[in-house]
């Protein structure tokens, strides 16, 4: 649960999470020079955690995964959570993903933060689906007093400026109810290449744009997200979300104070 941040609070150490998405490491849309700038900028930030919310590839081929892996490995960060997107599930790409990046759904815990990565893809389909068979596992992972982060490729709420909307998970309503019931603090998504933020019943939902491709919507630049969390192990703290532009510049898009129920 969050409320608007006030002034005059004592400065505390931040935990930094970088959220990138939709790399699509294959021609003709991938921009290698921009990918270099993304890596350079992330390494300057020195985040504790990096989350990649899918679409590492264009068509799910092994050489695309290897190329994406090469870039991700150059990010200087001890904790990396990588999950697949719908493009990664094409051409049995989910098998290559598992071999290179491990399980498609996973949980990581670090410094008072629990991150639950969920595979929302289906083979050779753009539509998303989490699946009831995962609900019990998700709920178990979120039974913690940590700052709770859930990451999945498909956004759970439609995103403006994306045209006809048909790509939220088929069970988005059930997943939203589950995450809110589990008092999830933050949800990270990608998919439509348009950055956006929703605040739903105190749960912040952050959509990332594409980090380093030319597959951008009109008048929207490539970007990734930086999330700063003051002392996640404490009952109160401030979250700040910045939109980072690899071509230069940044923008503070959200500042909220966390208040545990």
Please identify what each model-predicted range represents.
Residues 230-261:
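A short C-terminal boundary segment appended to hydrolase-like catalytic domains
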Residues 2-71, 140-144:
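N-terminal active-site segment of His-dependent metallophosphoesterases
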Residues 62-144, 174-180, 226:
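Extended active-site neighborhood of metal-dependent phosphoesterases/phosphodiesterases
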Residues 164-235:
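Conserved beta-sheet core of the metallophosphoesterase superfamily
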Residues 12-18, 107-117, 143-147, 199-205:
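Beta-strand-turn-beta hairpins that frame and shape the catalytic cleft
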Residues 144-161:
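Short acidic, glycine-rich surface-loop motifs adjacent to enzyme active sites
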Residues 26-29, 58-63, 86-93, 123-126, ...:
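Active-site environment of divalent metal-dependent phosphoester hydrolases
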Residues 19-21, 50-55, 80-86, 119, ...:
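Active-site neighborhood of phospho(di)ester-bond hydrolases with catalytic His/Asp-centered motifs
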């Amino acid at each position: 649960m969050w409320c608007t941040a006030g002034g005059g609070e004592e400065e505390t150490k931040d935990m930094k999470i970088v959220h990138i998405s939709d790399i699509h490491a294959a021609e003709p849309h991938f921009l290698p020079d921009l990918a270099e700038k993304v890596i350079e900028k992330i390494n300057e930030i020195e985040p504790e955690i990096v989350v990649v919310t899918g679409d590492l590839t264009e068509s799910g081929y092994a050489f695309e995964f290897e190329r994406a892996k090469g870039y991700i490995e150059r990010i200087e960060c001890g904790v990396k959570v990588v999950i697949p997107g719908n493009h990664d599930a094409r051409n049995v790409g989910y098998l290559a993903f598992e071999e290179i990046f491990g399980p498609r759904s996973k949980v990581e815990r670090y410094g008072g933060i629990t991150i639950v990565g969920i595979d929302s893809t289906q083979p050779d389909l753009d539509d998303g689906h989490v699946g009831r068979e995962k609900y019990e596992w998700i709920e178990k992972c979120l039974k913690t007093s940590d700052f709770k982060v859930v990451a999945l490729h498909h956004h759970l709420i439609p995103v403006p400026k994306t045209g006809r909307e048909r790509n939220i998970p088929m069970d988005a309503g059930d997943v939203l109810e589950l995450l809110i019931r589990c008092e999830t603090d933050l949800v990270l998504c990608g998919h439509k290449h348009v950055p956006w933020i929703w605040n739903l019943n105190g749960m912040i939902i952050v959509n990332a744009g594409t980090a380093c491709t030319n597959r951008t919507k009109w008048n929207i630049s490539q970007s990734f997200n930086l999330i700063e969390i003051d002392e996640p192990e404490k009952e109160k703290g401030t979250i700040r979300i910045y939109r980072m532009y690899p071509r230069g510049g940044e923008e503070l898009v959200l500042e909220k104070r966390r208040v545990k129920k």
